[in-house]
Design a protein with these regions (language model features):
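Predominantly soluble domains enriched in secretory-pathway, periplasmic, or organellar proteins
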Residues: 1-334
Length: 334
């Protein structure tokens, strides 16, 4: 299928990969046999997916037609179809930021509607839907914290972010950092940043600032701004080494040949690397000793030692993009 913006989740035993293609295709791949186990074209345009807490359900977020479809992980048979209908005219919204959450939940955002929805799939035959409206303009991506408690949507249509505490749903959506960027001249946005790879280190979170050459630091106890770090370009992914000691950042064009490393104690940039043109994605080994980088424009995957920052290996690959290790099978939201 179309893998231009594809993503992958894994079964609990790490044997099967579920690939979400931009063409609406959902493909189940047997990694041991090296073959496709099942495939379905479930929409015209999809933008990612998630696997349920128990590993029995796979959900896909769709742009066209807007909504979420949920499938049996074994057979890829349709279990639930949730159209993202909003307003009084029956319009359908693009869906983004789909993640799994504890309790057999899927959480996602509606770009056009400015809403966050939660679907409880504890009883797959009777999905329970809960909607939170008026969260802000154009949520463009979202994340769930590693403990599965907070769902946070970045807003493209206005400054700030929308946060939902999944432990206390009755409190509703809270706006955090509402004044961020006020009075500042915004730059053209060359590549939408991704919040999935935001970095958590102790009580601090590091997130890319939309349209700015900055990484935003958030105090997770108060959900207030704790600092801003000037970086080389517009950040796309801000990802923490598994121990949280360092944060690695890649950038949008024209600065996408560069990686910067931030020390999470001093908040200083301690290393700058230039792996090559078109660094699109980063993935750390589960214990953090290595990081793999896709260098699309030079048809390579680079492997760096995260302690010495030296390049350990380089592998040829045709236009590599996302890198997804099977260890993601055991992490919430991935």
């Amino acid at each position: 299928g179309d893998l231009s913006h594809a993503s992958v989740v894994y079964s609990r035993d790490e044997r099967y990969a579920y690939i979400f293609g931009r063409d609406g295709g959902l493909t189940k791949v047997d990694l041991l046999q090296g073959q496709i186990s099942a495939r379905t074209i479930q929409s015209g345009n999809s933008i990612g997916g998630a696997i349920s807490q128990d590993g029995r359900l796979v959900a896909v977020s769709n742009y066209k037609p807007g909504g979420v479809k949920i499938f049996d992980a074994d057979t890829l048979k349709l279990v639930a179809d949730i159209p993202a209908v909003y307003g009084n005219n029956g319009e359908r919204s693009k869906v983004i930021g789909l993640v799994d959450a504890p309790g057999q939940l899927f959480v996602f955002s509606l770009w056009d509607a400015g809403e966050i929805w939660i679907v409880d799939m504890s009883d797959a035959a009777s999905p329970q839907l809960r909607k939170f409206q008026g969260i802000g303009q154009n949520p463009y991506d979202a994340l769930i914290t590693p403990d599965g408690r907070y769902y946070i949507a970045g807003l493209f249509g206005e400054d700030g972010m929308a946060m939902l505490d999944l432990w206390n749903l009755q409190a509703g959506v809270k706006r955090i950092l509402p004044g961020y960027g006020k009075g500042e001249e915004k730059l053209p946005v060359y590549k939408m940043p991704h919040l999935e790879g935001w970095a958590v280190a102790g009580d601090l979170a590091f997130v890319p600032a939309v349209g700015r050459h900055e990484v935003l630091v958030i105090n997770m106890r108060t959900w207030e701004e704790a600092g801003r770090i000037k970086v080389h370009g517009q950040p796309v992914f801000v990802m923490a080494r598994p121990d949280g000691r360092h944060v690695w950042v890649n950038f949008a064009v024209p600065d996408n040949d560069t990686i910067q490393v931030i020390d999470t104690q001093s908040l200083n940039i301690i290393k700058q690397l230039t792996p090559g043109k078109g660094v699109l994605h980063m993935e750390f080994e589960p214990r953090g000793e290595e990081v793999w980088l896709s260098v699309r424009d030079e048809d390579r995957v680079e492997i760096y030692d995260t302690k010495s920052f030296e390049r350990k290996a380089s592998m040829p690959a045709r236009k590599p993009s996302g890198i997804f290790f099977t260890a993601r099978a055991h992490r919430i939201g991935l």
